[in-house]
Structures are given as structure tokens and as C-alpha cells.
């Protein structure tokens, strides 16, 4: 094996070096503290587990992003987690089994066989929060507000939010009695805003339903879109109108809480259609070609664990959050250099300083005081008689 092959990393897999790793860790603690202040409890999930659990209710997209291996002990297929959300849903449905609402949060590395986009990392640090047990728009407003509070904490500038609701398309598709194949084709056409294909795929439907499905292509824009949708989808089935009501309620409450936040609505945006069941949302910033935080409602995810509960939540990549955020992350700097010595009094002094939160670096055999600068030390312990004192490091 050539030397270059020993240090070469796969595409999309990166190592994080100091001080960037320290900045990410400080940000992780700050965000988890924020989540805790909202009542969200931290959970830790396995990096690898049986494939059936990882892919529950998640659709084919997650299947394609999951690295798969065979467990040498059981012979069963396992996967490295590509999304922590299904794991947290299992904790709520099967392990905790709470009757009332449950608020959970997490932060951990995930691994993607396929990146989200060409330039995306395949080893992001997924961080997010989930609220289980409440089906009202209030839960959606809470998790969206928490997501925005997280972005404010990181001081991410020029945030824009997209809002949609998969229940609108799903309700119309069911009313039209579309086959699975045609529904998927229509879904693909709507994502591309391919109006000619949408017209062709709905040509054999009753005129009113065809017109409403075609309307989803251009029902996108500002707050006025919701008023237009009320008119153009007036004859829609009750579930579609209920979805519009939910979306309007969420939008009004977000506008009241975050009056400076630009809101964009796209009723043909079906992000996570095979996974989400209600409102879907994503945050974008100029110059970044994909969402930096996203989420939505997914009420069916716990069914395979024997307990389907209403659920809504969001996630982000912590590394992206730190890269885009402008908040000052203050890292501890400097330290105290200690000579290589077996003196008992020195050891007691070192222990005391460390217990006080000081950074203390002890020289190894053969190291000279000149190595202190490389160790980022600005002070040193100097012996005066039987005592040791902290003194500035000589220039």
C-alpha cells in the first residue's frame, strides 16, 4: 500500500482539527443547553443497529443513504445510522412509553453512503429536537420556534424559511384515486414544477380535481399564497382544507413571534413526502444551495414499534451551523507550563490548579521550556524554595 493511501480519506469524510473541533464542541454544548431550557431531554442512540429498526417508516431515500454490514454474531443485516430521528422515535414509542407529550433532543455523528448534495459531507454531526404526543399546530410552532432560537444563538445571518404541507397533495391524490405509480410520477413532476407533465398526468381525472392538482405548481410565494389557495382549492376534500387551516395557523403565529423572518410558502413542495405527514419546513441562507435546517410532522413513524404517536421535529448539521454562524465562540486560551519533576509539592499544586479549571501542561522528559509556546502556554510554575508559584512565561 502506497503511503498516500494510508492518509487519504474517502470523499465526503473529513477529520476536524483543533481549534475547529473545540469550537464545534462548545457550540454543541450551547445548543443542547438551549434545548434543555425548553424542556427537551437529551438521549444517545447507537451508531449501528439492525437495519429494520433504522429504516422504519423512513422511505427509500434513507435506505439508499445507509451503509450496510452483516453482523458476524447474529448473521443479520445491520446499518450505520444515517438519520437519528427513527431511533429517537423508537425510544419514545417502545422504551419510554409515556402517555403525555415527550420532548427529546440529540446530537451525534451520522454516516451517509450517498451525500445529500454534491458538496455535502457524508459524516455530518446531526443535531435536533423532537416533540411527541401532540397533534396540534402548537407543537409545530414550538419546534420551529426552537429551531429559529438555535439559529439565533449561532447568529446565522439572512435566514429565510420555506413552509409547506404534504397533507394538501396527499389529500388531493387520494381523492383522485391515483395508483401508486401515477402518484409517484405526479410527485416527481410537481417537484420539478413541470406543468406540462402535471397536465398530462391529470388529464383523465375529474376536471375539478385535475385543476386543483395543477394549481399546486404555482401556489408558491409569500403570505398571499395561502389566500389564493383558499380560493383555488375551495372544493377540495376536508383533509386538504384542514391542512390549509393548520398551515395558516402556524404561519400567523410564526409571523407574530418572528416579524422580521421572511416566510415563503410552496404548496407543491413535498420534501420528505413518504416520511412526513403534515407541515414541512426548511431554512435557507443566501449562497448555500441546500437547507441548513429542516423538519416537519411525521405522525406515523412509531407505528412499527407498536405505538404510533403524533410527532414533529427538526434537525441540522452542527458543523454547518458553526461554519455559517457568526456568533463568537470563545475558546480557552493559554495555560500553565510545568517542568518535568517528581516533586510532591509540585504535583499537589498541579492538581489544585486543574481543579480550579486551569489548563496545566506538564513537560515530558527531555522537553525544554521553549516547548511551552508550542503547547499554547503563557505561564509557568517556578519553584521558590519549597513552594511553587505561577509566573508569566519568559519571552
UniProtKB/Swiss-Prot annotation:
Short name of one Pfam family: tRNA-synt_His
Family: Belongs to the class-II aminoacyl-tRNA synthetase family. HisZ subfamily.
Superkingdom classification of source: Bacteria
GO cellular component: cytoplasm
Recorded metabolic or biological pathway in which this protein acts: Amino-acid biosynthesis; L-histidine biosynthesis; L-histidine from 5-phospho-alpha-D-ribose 1-diphosphate: step 1/9
Protein's job: Required for the first step of histidine biosynthesis. May allow the feedback regulation of ATP phosphoribosyltransferase activity by histidine.
Species of provenance: Pseudomonas syringae pv. syringae (strain B728a)
Keywords: Amino-acid biosynthesis, Cytoplasm, Histidine biosynthesis
Keyword RNA-binding: no
Signal peptide location: none
Protein name: ATP phosphoribosyltransferase regulatory subunit
InterPro entries associated with the record: aa-tRNA-synth_II/BPL/LPL, HisRS-like_core, HisRS/HisZ, HisZ
Amino acid at each position: 500500500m502506497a503511503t498516500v493511501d494510508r492518509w487519504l480519506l474517502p470523499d465526503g469524510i473529513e477529520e476536524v482539527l483543533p481549534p475547529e473541533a473545540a469550537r464545534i464542541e462548545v457550540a454543541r454544548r450551547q445548543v443542547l443547553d438551549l434545548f434543555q431550557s425548553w424542556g427537551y431531554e437529551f438521549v444517545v442512540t447507537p451508531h449501528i443497529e439492525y437495519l429494520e429498526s433504522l429504516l422504519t417508516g423512513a422511505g427509500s431515500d434513507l435506505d439508499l443513504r445507509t451503509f450496510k454490514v452483516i453482523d458476524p454474531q447474529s448473521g443479520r443485516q445491520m446499518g450505520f445510522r444515517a438519520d437519528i430521528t427513527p431511533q429517537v422515535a423508537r425510544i419514545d414509542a417502545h422504551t419510554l412509553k409515556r402517555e403525555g407529550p415527550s420532548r427529546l433532543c440529540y446530537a451525534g455523528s451520522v454516516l451517509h453512503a450517498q451525500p445529500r448534495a454534491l458538496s455535502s459531507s457524508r459524516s455530518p454531526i446531526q443535531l435536533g429536537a423532537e416533540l411527541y404526543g401532540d397533534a396540534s399546530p402548537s407543537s409545530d410552532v414550538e419546534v420551529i420556534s426552537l429551531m429559529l432560537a438555535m439559529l439565533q444563538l449561532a447568529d446565522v445571518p439572512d435566514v429565510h424559511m420555506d413552509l409547506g404541507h404534504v397533507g394538501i397533495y396527499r389529500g388531493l391524490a387520494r381523492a383522485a384515486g391515483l395508483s401508486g405509480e401515477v402518484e409517484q410520477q405526479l410527485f416527481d413532476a410537481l417537484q420539478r414544477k413541470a406543468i406540462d407533465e402535471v397536465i398530462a398526468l391529470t388529464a383523465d381525472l375529474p376536471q375539478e380535481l385535475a385543476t386543483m392538482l395543477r394549481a399546486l405548481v404555482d401556489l408558491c410565494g409569500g403570505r398571499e399564497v395561502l389566500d389564493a389557495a383558499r380560493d383555488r382549492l375551495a372544493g377540495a376534500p376536508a383533509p386538504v382544507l384542514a391542512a390549509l387551516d393548520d398551515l395558516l395557523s402556524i404561519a400567523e403565529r410564526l409571523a407574530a413571534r418572528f416579524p422580521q423572518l421572511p416566510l415563503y410558502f410552496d404548496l407543491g413542495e413535498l420534501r420528505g413526502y413518504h416520511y412526513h405527514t403534515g407541515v414541512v419546513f426548511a431554512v435557507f441562507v443566501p449562497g448555500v444551495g441546500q437547507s441548513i435546517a429542516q423538519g416537519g410532522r411525521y405522525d406515523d413513524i412509531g407505528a412499527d414499534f407498536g405505538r404510533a404517536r403524533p410527532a414533529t421535529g427538526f434537525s441540522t448539521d452542527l458543523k454547518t451551523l458553526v461554519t455559517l454562524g457568526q456568533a463568537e465562540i470563545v475558546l480557552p486560551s493559554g495555560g500553565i507550563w510545568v517542568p518535568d519533576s517528581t516533586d510532591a509539592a509540585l504535583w499537589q499544586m498541579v492538581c489544585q490548579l486543574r481543579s480550579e479549571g486551569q489548563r496545566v501542561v506538564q513537560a515530558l522528559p527531555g522537553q525544554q521550556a521553549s516547548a511551552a509556546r508550542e503547547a499554547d502556554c503563557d505561564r509557568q510554575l517556578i519553584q521558590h524554595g519549597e513552594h511553587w508559584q505561577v509566573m508569566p512565561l519568559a519571552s
